[in-house]
Structure formats: structure tokens, C-alpha cells
Amino acid sequence: MDIRAAEISAILKDQIKNFGQEAEVSEVGQVLSVGDGIARVYGLDNVLAGEMVEFENGTRGMALNLETDNVGVVIFGADREIKEGQTVKRTRSIVDAPVGKGLLGRVVDALGNPIDGKGPIQAVERKRVDVKAPGIIPRKSVHEPMATGLKSIDALIPIGRGQRELIIGDRQTGKTAIALDTILNQKPLNVEGAPESQKLYCVYVAVGQKRSTVAQFVKVLEEQGALEYSVVVAATASDPAPMQYIAPFTGCTIGEYFRDNGMHAVIIYDDLSKQAVAYRQMSLLLRRPPGREAYPGDVFYLHSRLLERAAKLNDEQGNGSLTALPVIETQANDVSAYIPTNVISITDGQIFLETDLFFQGIRPAVNVGLSVSRVGSSAQTKAMKKVAGKIKGELAQYREMAAFAQFGSDLDAATQRLLNRGSRLTELLKQPQFSPLKMEEQVCVIWAGTNGYLDALPLNKVRAFEDGLLALLRGKESGILEAIRTSRDLSDDTAAKLKAVVESYAKTFA
């Protein structure tokens, strides 16, 4: 057999030509110790703060403490599989999450992975979870209403698109119920074919709640047809602390996609007390020095950098907005604890819910005296401004008088009238769950209350009067609601028509 030199040299030349010189470089470290969701890693000298790292078994982690001889990594998952001596490699990417309209109608975990069994998420891009909030120049003052559908909030503590309004109260006072009703109330705005400037997408972040509670919440959204314009981010009680810590940031990034693309979104963090507890756990295990109530010194910055990302952007930036409704759970109505005072000082107002009111049957259990909205009437339509100004004043007088009336039995007629009107208005502001009212319906009902049409009724008939009046306005007299809806104002002409309808209805009701 003859050896063909030319053929051999051709093969060798071909192989030399295709010889790849690029080698895959990966920086690898070793696990020194692991426990309680924290791993100490040696050898990752160039790792960035907040960078994702990957353990041997595929579990991800995030480098938080960069020390001289090791790196403190928080583990996004179970630490049982990770053992001392295993390798850890850099991913060269900061923690990111999927964003986009493909997430609507889905339930995802704290890193944006779907957990609802509906398959992979379609057509999305990825964004970093912890980015800087918009500066001062791109912002605009809040001027459009973000309707919750609850009379006591939309009339007395109005929320605007781009505002941050805290919902604060003890456990079992209806904080999540307010959030849920707000999501359900956006259904008429999110109809097919509606303009993007009208729509309001919803992001609900569940932190440290029971899985059954989150499942129930999602079920209600599905039944009411509200899941199609919502995203649920869940880091439940059984998830490790790092997942509960990162979930609000992931949710915020999902909401920011809408804000930055000229759309509107509302995000509900339920609740930030549990995120602070998870962050405290991580910080103590990373041996960071504790401060007040054993929280780390930067727990204020944790919440401020999250909530500052909710904003109303100006015309050059596309006019989008992200409204934040953080929830804080207090212990025995103590709003002077560390986390509640922090979040109160960051937000643009708060809705106080009280156990006593809840058990008196005033639901939503909003304490109107202590609750404020620092945006105020600029977040209301003209029609609502006209009727809400009056009810605010009357309720304030009523609260003052009710305190004094406990002492004196012989009250003059004017005081008696005031107390009578106040108790009727308080009754009027009650509202059952899952029955949000449109702005124009609230205006008509509150108008009837402040103009004295309820004064003669017994307290237990107020709800029936309201239901009957609304049925009449939605049916035969729908022109009045239509006029208020289109003009967003209560003109003299419409007010006269409304007066005639309410007067004739009051006669038949009596």
C-alpha cells in the first residue's frame, strides 16, 4: 500500500486550519461552608456584587457579601444538595427576570419561572431586577385617577396613577381584600380593543404567604376574568428567604416594562413586612451588624429603592406610569414600629385599616381620620371632587362630635342632625367584597348621601336604598351615568336630572 504524501499533507493542513484556539474560560470557586440558605465560597475573586453564580447541581445563588478571602452567597433554592468542596462558577450576569406581555395571565416564582403548569412563557425579553429608579427630569406630577372601585378610598383617599399608597393594618383587617378589589375594578378598562392609555395592567407580588392563600387568590382572579390582565409573582412561606427578598424586585421589573413602554400598571406588594423579615434573616446569617429591632442598617434603603421605582413619566418618556400599593402588617395597631414608620415616610400616603372598625362591621375597615393621600384631589375627576369635598368635611365634623356626644345626653338639634347625617354617610361607605363601583356610580350615591336624602332613613335601610338607586340609574336612567362618564364632570344640567331621579326614588322608597 503506497502512502500518498500529498493526501496526508492535505488532511493535516485541513485539520490545522480548523483547529479552534478559543478555550472556554470560566471562573470557578469552591464551597467552604453551607447552611441556612447561605454558602461561603472561596476563589471567586472577580465576582460582582449581586451577580448570579451557579452551583454544581444547577442551583443558582447571588453574591451579596464580598469579603477579602471569601464571598457570601445567598442560595435561590434548597441548600440540601450543596456540599462543602463543590465547585461554584460565575455566570457573569446580574440577577434578571423575564418581562413583557407574555407574562399576563401567568403565575411565576421569584425568578420569573412559571409555576402554574401552563408551559413556558412566550415572547419575552429579560431585564435586571434591581435597577435605578427614574430621575427627577423624566417624571411628571400625578394627575390621572387610579380607581379602586371602593367608595371610601376613591372619595376620601384618592390614588393617582404613579402614586405610592401604603395599605397598613393588623392581620385579618382586609388589606388583601382592598388589593383584590382594586385588581377586579380594572376589568372594564382592560377590555379588548381599548386604547393602551386607558388600560391598567396589574402585578401582584405575594411574599411569605401560605400557598393555599395564593392559590385561592389566583382562583378568584380567574373566576372573575381578571387574570388575563394580571401577573402573579409568588414567593410563598415555604420558599427560602432569598426568594422572598428578591420577589418584590422581580415584580417591580415586570411592572416597569409597562411603565417604560407608555402603558400603565399597578403593583401590589403583599406584604413588605415579610420581605423585611427575610432580608433580616439573610443579613444576620451573612454576619452583617444588626440595628434597631435586629434589622440591618440598610433596610430603609431596601424599601426606598423598591418604591421609588413607581413613577409617572412625562410625555417625552411615553407618559407611562407604575402605581405601587405596598402592604404592611402591624402588630396590635402599632404604626410606630420600625418597618411601618419607614414605609410610611417613603410612600405618598397611607390607608389605615383597624380591627375595631372591622368587627363593628365597617368594611372596608378604613380609618378615614388617620388615612391620607398626599396627592389628593389632583388624582380625582371633576365630578368626584365636587361630591367628595363635602363628604370629607361632614365626616370630620361627625368624628369630632361623636367623641363629645358620649358625654352629653341633651344635644341641640343641629348637633343631632350632624350625628344623624354622619352615621348615614359611614353606613353608605360600607361595601361588600367583589363589588367595586364605577366612578360615575360612586358620584351619584355619594351625592344622594351628602344632600340629605338618607337622613330620614333608618340605618339598616341605607344599603337597600343605595342598591335600588343604582339599579334605577343602570336601567331606565342610564343617561345620567353616561353623561358623568363621558364628561368626567357633574354639570348643573346632570345634577338637576340626578336630583329629580333621586327625589322621586326617595318618595317611592319611603
Curated annotation (Swiss-Prot):
Where is this protein localized, as stated in its record?
Answer: Cell inner membrane
- EC number(s) stated in the UniProt entry for this protein: 7.1.2.2
Q: What class of enzyme is it?
A: translocase
Question: According to Swiss-Prot or TrEMBL, what is its membrane topology?
Answer: Peripheral membrane protein
For this protein, the record's Gene3D superfamilies field holds: 2.40.30.20, ATP synthase alpha/beta chain, C-terminal domain, P-loop containing nucleotide triphosphate hydrolases
What are the binding positions for ATP in this chain? G169, D170, R171, Q172, T173, G174, K175, T176
What does the record give as the reaction this protein catalyses? ATP + H2O + 4 H(+)(in) = ADP + phosphate + 5 H(+)(out)
List the PROSITE patterns.
Answer: ATPASE_ALPHA_BETA
Where does the chain cross the membrane?
Answer: none
Q: State a single Gene Ontology molecular function.
A: ATP binding
Task: Summarize the protein's role.
Answer: Produces ATP from ADP in the presence of a proton gradient across the membrane. The alpha chain is a regulatory subunit.
Family designation:
Belongs to the ATPase alpha/beta chains family.
- Quaternary structure per UniProt? F-type ATPases have 2 components, CF(1) - the catalytic core - and CF(0) - the membrane proton channel. CF(1) has five subunits: alpha(3), beta(3), gamma(1), delta(1), epsilon(1). CF(0) has four main subunits: a(1), b(1), b'(1) and c(9-12).
The record's section on NCBIfam families has: atpA, PRK13343.1
Q: What is this protein called?
A: ATP synthase subunit alpha
Question: Which species is this UniProt entry from?
Answer: Rhodopseudomonas palustris (strain ATCC BAA-98 / CGA009)
